[in-house]
Amino acid sequence: MAKSEAKTVGIVDTEEALTAKIAEVRAAQAIFATYTQEQVDKIFKAAAIAANKARIPLAKMAVEETGMGIVEDKVIKNNYAAEHIYNKYKNVQTCGVFEENKAYGTMRIYEPIGLIAAVIPTTNPTSTAIFKTLICLKTRNGIIISPHPRAKKSTIAAAKIVYDAAVAAGAPKGIIGWIDVPSLELTNMIMRESDTILATGGPGMVKAAYSSGTPALGVGAGNASAIIDSSADIVNAVNSIIHSKTFDNGMICATEQTVIADKTVYNDVKKEFIKRGCYFLNDEEADKIRKTMLINGALNAKIVGQRPVTIAKMAGFEVPEDTKVLIGEATSTAPEEAFGHEKLTTILGMYKSKNFDDALDIAEALLVNNGGLGHTSVLWVDNINEREKLNKFAARMKTCRLIVHTPSSLGGIGDLYNFDFAPSLTLGCGSWGGNSVSENVGVKHLLNIKTVVERRENMLWFRAPEKVYFKKGCLPVALDELKTVMGKKKAFIVTDQFLYKNGYTKAITDKLDEMGILHETFFDVAPDPTLACALEGVAQLRAFEPDTIIAIGGGSAMDAGKIMWVLYEHPDADFFDMAMRYIDIRKRVYTFPKMGEKAYFIAIPTSSGTGSEVTPFAVITDEKTGTKYPLADYQLMPNMAIVDTDMMMSAPRGLTSASGIDALTHALEAYASVMATDYTDGLALRAMKLIFKYLPGAYDNGQTDVKAREEMATASTMAGMAFANAFLGVCHSMAHKLGAYHHLPHGIANALLITMVMRYNADPTPRKMGTFSQYQYPHTLERYCECAHSLGIVGKNDEDTLNKFIDAIEALKERVGIKKTIADYGVDEKHFLDTLDNMVEDAFDDQCTGANPRYPLMSELKEMYLKAYYGK
């Protein structure tokens, strides 16, 4: 019923009739949108064949109705619009799923736009109607044509031929419509009511399309200049320009409007034009043509598409009947110079250039002053031996079609002189021409693309040092490889003064001496290593040129060693860039330099806490500004870690407790992280169990309880491996800044914050949850309960279990001498409050924040800081 009722719409000459026509076409398009590619292609072919068969009568009708152009050339245009458009798109998919990646879970689907409003110019009425209706049929769009009043009969005739053939081939009735009695009001209405406008015409019409509130594919005025270089083939250039300019009496918008000839060939170019039947105007004739061409600054419509003899008569003089083109010589590029404007007829302006750069200047000035930006530019040059000129031309001209060695009217529309250039009768001019498209308009511009995106989890990895040696007394055995396996010659040791003076490096140097490996030691690492410290070490490194770097100590020594390693291998490394925050370490903007090309890196911990021996992290401080640069990249992962309990037996109680709780925090945050995996979970759980069991013994009897020391060393390294891959959370973000602003030891800072952060993270209804594909919903409470259960802590329910778990952590902290609050560590209240807002913002921006299961608001971080300070 809908299809038969739609055909009752009669002549479209009022807004009411157009409203009915719009409804008719929309109804037909809704049906057409369900067609398969096979059905569409059948219709597309049938319509193209019908249009091609009617190419001659349509050409005659267009010339008779408009009084412009040449029948024989319009036959070619009609043929082109049917044949070349069909050939270009006959095998192009425009329906349904066109791309699917099952591995990535993406699918892309072509969908029609809906109703297209097509504004048709008087210069190319039938060919443009054929072109636009065909590409709409290919894309399952409905179309309503608004013809130019001077060309309405021929335009509608072309549209009706395509429509009848399409319906006969199976298209829904009403899929193509037109305005029978065109007016500005009806044109504006269809532009407003359509889904997209295909606008071809003058600047005013294009501006109206873009101002309609409807998405528009508009084109602009052409004003192509053809530069003839001194190296050009003059005969080819001149005759191609004549061929182009006389085609349909110059009415294709890409046609040459001016010629710019180099002074060395100017006279030869002029002679060739004359030889081939062109007429050079004298000064008096040129002035008459100027006055005829432009009326009140606008192109005189009466000259468009006319023969030279006709135009000359309008101007009041005569030229030979067989004159091909009228040529006016000019020097000014100002808007007042009529020969510098678009003419759409058989008139050319001609300029003389001093050299190639001057030719570019003239061409550019004509575009800027007289219109045509974005449309077309033409070059004739020896493109083999003068390639640089072609490149300069391409760089300078602000046009979307840069036509080389080609008649631009036929070359600009595509596919005739270069088969990789899409055929079209709607030529986009890009932003330079005020357009939304910068290429020849085709079927892709009339399609919406739906993208179906299924959730996919990231590819994950587990990264660790190539070799990890552990057990008491493993150091000399591990170092054997430097000689027996790797053949190393020189080793550079990085440590701090305390460890050096207390003989911690002696076991290393003795072994190196035994193997005949030369060595030097840098022992000036400060607790918070600075860039100055690292540079001092690097100077020594460069002088010594080692092939091995051995960092021994706590986190500071290992961090300093990593930084020196970076500067040694990459002196131009920029810490600001390397410290840049990222969401995904694999997608960071900055690519970390490849490490290990100069030196093999070994990390040996002397405390059980940081895990730095197995992590890709380091922190360096700029001593001039106080800025800390946290670096994170797997290139910073040590090549070898040696975890020898002999190096940890004499660690003082304060270091033992602080580093032990630091390791516990590593395990807890790695387990709660949005990036936690089965590979990291096992390490984190085992580390927690070992810490709860052995930290008190290591704290009480550190120098004699070998078992406790060894298990704490294992726990620290396992927790390090866990957070090296799962990353950390806001406890570490806040602890980093608490330490930076108030100089609390890192382990202590973590200890003061961890249970508060656990309560914060465990909220089943957080304001915001962390963002990572693997993390599907807030479940941190359950995760903490899993940790508790692994320790044998079980409550009545999850909330009770969490409370008991937190009580156990607080008891462990108290057992190893950790105080309750930030205030208890002597941090001045006023100073704390004065720095609080800065701490909060810096903590929010810390690299660790992104992996937290609850994405924090700054106000929430502030509240936790205050609670940690006051203990309530």
Q: Which residue stretches match the model-derived regions?
A:
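Gly/Pro-rich interdomain helix-loop hinge
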Residues: Y741-L833, G871
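Carboxylate- and glycine-rich phosphate/diphosphate-binding segment that chelates Mg2+/Mn2+
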Residues: N267, K275, V614-A726
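Rossmann-like NAD(P) dinucleotide-binding subdomain of oxidoreductase/dehydrogenase enzymes
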Residues: V97-N236
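Conserved C-terminal structural/oligomerization subdomain of aldehyde/semialdehyde dehydrogenase
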Residues: K3, K7, A33, F317-N458
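N-terminal Rossmann-like NAD(P)+-binding subdomain of aldehyde/semialdehyde dehydrogenases
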Residues: A2-M107, I135, K275
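ATP/NTP phosphate-donor binding region
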Residues: M459-T548, I822-A823
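Glycine/threonine-rich beta-strand-loop-alpha-helix active-site module
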Residues: N87, Q93, A158, A532-D646
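ALDH superfamily catalytic-core signature
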Residues: E5, V12-T14, V206-A334, D361
